[in-house]
Amino acid sequence: RRQRQMCIRDSTGCPGSMARSMERAPVNQPASFIPMPSQLRQWPVQIKLVPVNAPYFDGASLLIAADCTAYAYANFHQDFIRGKVTLVGCPKLDDVDYSEKLTEILRQNNIKSVTVVRMEVPCCGGLEYAVRTALQNCGKLLPWQVKTISIKGELLDD
């Protein structure tokens, strides 16, 4: 636990804060490129801002994602947001424990399932921990899964 706290508090000591560049080969866009529409179903999306009793939670599959994941993983909307109510947060930048609010969202609403999408960096473990705590404290048995994105934007094996 002490290491996690140090990682969250001290950006100079956290491996997730280390500056890196990724060399990528240019990608040719097909001539028939059609922009994909957003799959976002509700607003707000920030865990800190969403009301725990919002009507869109009723019967929802919930996506709880680290802020960076949508930037790192190119097909985020299609692979993760589509069909889900989306909440985002960053345990490193938001000086708050999400577990209490997430517990109330799970307790007060008819949530069908929970998917957590996090980055591979250690500090992102705080988001997974908050969701795990909320699932343990909500008084319900809900199906859930964790997906991890690499800093290179790849979906890692479970």
Annotate each PLM feature.
Residues R1-R2, R41:
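Extended, compositionally biased low-complexity polar/Lys-Gly-rich tracts
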Residues T12-M18, A65-A72, R118-Y129:
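Local cysteine-cluster metal-coordination motifs and their immediate loop/turn environment
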Residues S99, T103-M119, G126-K147, D158:
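C-terminal folded domains that constitute the principal catalytic or ligand-binding module
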Residues I149-L155:
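Short, conserved secondary-structure transition motifs
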